């Protein structure tokens, strides 16, 4: 199948739109389809998807912009692939939105969207490039321009995404991995390797093992499962190294158990080796574990960057990773993707994105990073009044205005300064307790770091009117996780795995951005005004 761009961007003389009555045409142009057809569909860039298709002359592909547009519409209304395809054949609004009113036959069949997604999954698995991400973020940037949103103010937040899996106990996890591999061997006519384990193939065996027995038999069940697992490892050897079920069994045993003198037992806390990336459920090997805000999460995490203006807000960047990915690393990745800003812009985040390294990386891109909260304990405000040289390698003056007698620098790793003053200068200074000055026999000494100096400056900034206005802007991004969960069912995606979850999440971001644009076009938005956005 070869790649061909979709040139059908205008109505033809035989277009089905002309067969509608004037009343029907007016109703169509007042609907969501008008905004989608004029502002979203033409902005879908098909060119990056060229790599998914053959360069040889062959049957042309289904238009990429129709596929991407249909996937976004699917998330807007929360419907299935089949419903999208049926509606495209029967509903003029869908045809108008996707510019297919002039087609003799609608271009989507029952497998079109599935095959398109599969091509994107395979390409990302091989090359590590998410083609949909570039498309959705490009649409977000275009929507921001249509809504007249200045890109100089942005805010950021992260959210947990639940994986589509059951929470398993350790013994259930071991049983499931053994059962899946036994079932694989049975289906592939390898019954000689599973003698005595045929009960794993019984659909009711799971319930018999865990629900129809008393607690006293749990130890015996665990021993039996571990012995069966060892038996499978001995009989299969290296012949099944490429089989997913075998790989998951080996992974589970290496993470959950330990072998002592040829005897396998469960790993304990004293043995160590527990980590958040351990297998949670063989149905989704990519899902990880994280405890956040007193709650346990299994699955993934998403980071959202929202551009804010007087006419509303639009998500202009997002990232989808395993949930043990830190907020600080999300910010670093975002800054790495961001080009240098000709005009200084502001990024407003919470305390999880704070840190001098992040502030320095943002400054390199001409971005002012504002944290509405700071992690760790507060420090004395007096540290903000120490004056450093231009390159930040020497203390020039203390808060009382004294020049130091000497200044020792520990280097770029700890960035601490050991500063000496005349003994009387600190001994008689009213700030000596706040600076934690040490009075020696001949001199006085103070230890101050660049990090503490920057933190004190941030704490001082938090008391200003400008910060309070920025804080109000930051609060708005907290609505995104709620919207994505309630309206777009981000915690109930019908797929498993990091790559598939990332693709579906991108479609949901596209749907949410369209809703924001449609609200703006219809004049239905109510946007709180802020002096920072003026």
Regions from the PLM with identified roles:
Residues 80-83, 88, 102, 106, ...:
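Anion-binding and metal-coordination hotspots
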Residues 3, 64-65:
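Double-stranded DNA-binding cores of transcription factors and transposases
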Residues 46, 50, 54, 76-79, ...:
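Short helix-loop boundary/capping segments at the starts of domains
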Residues 68-78:
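Alpha-helical support elements that line or immediately flank enzyme active sites
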Residues 52-60, 495-497:
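A short glycine/serine-rich beta->alpha loop
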Residues 39-44, 59-64, 87-89:
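Helix-boundary capping/turn motifs
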């Amino acid at each position: 199948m070869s790649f061909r761009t979709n040139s059908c961007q205008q109505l033809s003389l035989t277009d089905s739109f002309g067969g509608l009555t004037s009343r029907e045409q007016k109703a169509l142009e007042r609907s969501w389809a008008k905004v989608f057809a004029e502002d979203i569909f033409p902005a879908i860039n098909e060119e990056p998807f060229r790599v998914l298709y053959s360069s040889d002359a062959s049957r042309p592909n289904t238009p990429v912009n129709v596929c991407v547009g249909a996937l976004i519409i699917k998330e807007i209304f929360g419907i299935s692939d089949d419903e999208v395809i049926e509606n495209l054949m029967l509903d003029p609004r869908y045809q108008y939105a996707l510019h297919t009113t002039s087609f003799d036959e609608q271009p989507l069949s029952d497998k079109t969207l599935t095959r398109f997604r599969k091509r994107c999954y395979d390409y990302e698995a091989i090359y590590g490039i998410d083609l949909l991400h570039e498309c959705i973020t490009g649409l977000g940037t275009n929507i921001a321009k249509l809504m007249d949103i200045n890109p100089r103010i942005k805010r950021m937040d992260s959210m947990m995404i639940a994986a589509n899996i059951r929470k398993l106990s350790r013994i259930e996890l071991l049983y499931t991995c053994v059962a899946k591999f036994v079932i694989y061997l049975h289906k592939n006519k390898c019954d000689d390797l599973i003698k005595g384990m045929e009960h794993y193939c019984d659909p009711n065996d799971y319930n018999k093992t865990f629900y129809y027995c008393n607690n006293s038999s749990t130890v015996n069940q665990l021993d039996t499962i571990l012995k069966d697992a060892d038996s499978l490892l001995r009989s299969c050897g290296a012949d099944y190294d490429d089989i997913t079920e075998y790989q998951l069994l080996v992974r589970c045993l290496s993470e959950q158990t330990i072998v002592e003198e040829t005897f396998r037992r469960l790993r304990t806390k004293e043995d160590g080796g527990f980590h958040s990336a351990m297998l949670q459920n063989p149905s989704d090997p990519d899902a990880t574990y994280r405890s956040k805000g007193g709650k346990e999460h299994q699955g993934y995490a998403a980071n959202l960057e929202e551009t804010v203006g007087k006419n509303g807000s639009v998500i202009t960047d997002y990232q989808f990773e395993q949930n043990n990915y830190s907020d600080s690393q999300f910010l670093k990745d975002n800054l790495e993707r961001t080009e240098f800003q000709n005009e200084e812009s502001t990024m407003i985040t919470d305390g999880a994105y704070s840190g001098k390294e992040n502030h320095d990386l943002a400054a390199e891109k001409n971005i002012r990073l504002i944290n509405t909260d700071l992690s760790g304990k507060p420090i004395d405000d007096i540290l903000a009044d120490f004056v450093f040289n231009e390159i930040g390698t020497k203390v020039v003056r203390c808060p009382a205005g004294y020049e130091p007698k000497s200044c020792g620098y520990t280097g770029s790793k700890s960035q601490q300064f050991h500063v000496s003053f005349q003994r009387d200068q600190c001994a008689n200074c009213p700030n000596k307790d706040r600076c934690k000055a040490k009075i020696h026999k001949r001199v006085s000494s103070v230890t101050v770091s660049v990090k503490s100096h920057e933190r004190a400056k941030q704490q001082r900034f938090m008391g200003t009117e400008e910060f309070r206005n920025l804080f109000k802007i930051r609060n708005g991004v907290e609505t995104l996780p709620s919207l994505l969960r309630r309206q777009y069912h981000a915690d109930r995606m019908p797929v498993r795995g990091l790559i598939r979850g990332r693709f579906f999440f991108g479609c949901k971001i596209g749907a949410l951005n369209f809703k924001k644009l449609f609200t703006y076009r219809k004049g239905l938005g109510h946007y709180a005004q802020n002096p920072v956005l003026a």
